[in-house]
From Swiss-Prot:
The active site is at C142, H235, E237. InterPro entries: Class_I_gatase-like (IPR029062), HST_MetA (IPR005697), MetA_family (IPR033752). GO terms for biological process: L-methionine biosynthetic process from homoserine via O-succinyl-L-homoserine and cystathionine. It catalyses: L-homoserine + succinyl-CoA = O-succinyl-L-homoserine + CoA. Pathway: Amino-acid biosynthesis; L-methionine biosynthesis via de novo pathway; O-succinyl-L-homoserine from L-homoserine: step 1/1. GO terms for molecular function: homoserine O-acetyltransferase activity; homoserine O-succinyltransferase activity. This is Homoserine O-succinyltransferase. It comes from Aeromonas salmonicida (strain A449). Its main location: cytoplasm. Keywords: Acyltransferase, Amino-acid biosynthesis, Cytoplasm, Methionine biosynthesis, Transferase. The record marks G111 as: Important for acyl-CoA specificity. Pfam families: HTS. Its EC number is 2.3.1.46. It is found in: Cytoplasm.
Amino acid sequence: MPIKIPDQLPAAEVLGQENIFVMTESRAVTQNIRPLRVLILNLMPKKIETEIQLMRMLSNSPLQVDVDLLRIDDRESKNTPQAHLENFYHDFEQVRGNNYDGMIITGAPLGLVEFEEVVYWPRIVEIIEWSHQHVTSTLFLCWAVQAALKALYGMEKQTHGEKLSGVYRHHRLDENEPLLRGFDDEFVAPHSRYAAFDGDLIRAHTDLQIFAESEEAGVYLAATKDCRQVFVTGHPEYDVLTLDGEYQRDLAAGLDPVIPVNYYPNNDPALPPRASWRSHGHLLFSNWLNYYVYQLTSYRVEDIGKVFTYQQPK
C-alpha cells in the first residue's frame, strides 16, 4: 500500500523518481476505497486447479479483490464438471457490459495449433479489443502472451522444436520497475510451452518494455508503456506438482517428454520436486494488483472506459 506524506515534502519528488508510489495528502483526501474487480478468462483444461492457483496469488494482498470467472468455449469439458462451469462461470455476453479493474487471461495447451485453427480465436481477439475500454490492466499468461502479440502487434508465433519445460533462471533489466519491486536481481520461474519469445524480435516488432529475460527461456516479463497490458511468458502461479503432473500425463500418453529442467532433485522424476519460485510468483501478482491495477484504476468502476483512451500499438 502507498505511504501518505505532505505534498511539498522533498521525499515525494525523490521517491517518485525511483518509481516508489507515495500518496500526497491532497490526493488522499479525495480517495475512497472499494473492492477491486478482476475478471479471469480461464482457458486451461483443469479449470478448478487453475482457479485455485490464481486466487491464491490474488489473495496475497491487503486489497480486497472481487473475482468473476469467464469461459468462452461452450463445448463440454473433459476435465471440469459441467455443473461447476454452470454455477461459477460467465459467458462473455453476460459480462460484456461490465468494467473491471484487472483481467487475467490464462495459458492454454495450444502451443502447436495455428491461431486460425483455434475454435474460439475470433472471441479471443474480440475480448482483447473489448478490454481496451473495459479493463484497467490485463495480465496475459503463457499462451495468452502469444495470442496478445498476434492480436495487438500482428506477430506470428515462434515455436521451439522441443517443449520448454522446467524452472529457469531470469535476470531483471530495470531496477526501479514497480512490477519487480522486491525481486532479487536473479530469480526463477516455471515454464511449460512450445512458444518462443525472442527478445530481439519483440523489440523489433513492438514498443513493449521488457523487464526480465532468461538466456534459455527468452523474454519473461514485459508490458506496454501505459501499464495496461502485462505479458508473463511463464507460469508463476504453478503449484509445486503442476509440472510433474504435466510430465506424468505426457509420459502416459507415450509422448516421450523431456524431464523438466531444474525441477526434480538430481534430475530424477522419482524424487519429489521442490518449489523454488513461490515467493517471486506471489510478489509478481501483488505488484501487478498494487501498481498496475489499484494505482491506475478509477474509483468508480463505471468510469474506467472514460478514463483511458486506447492507442493502437505501433
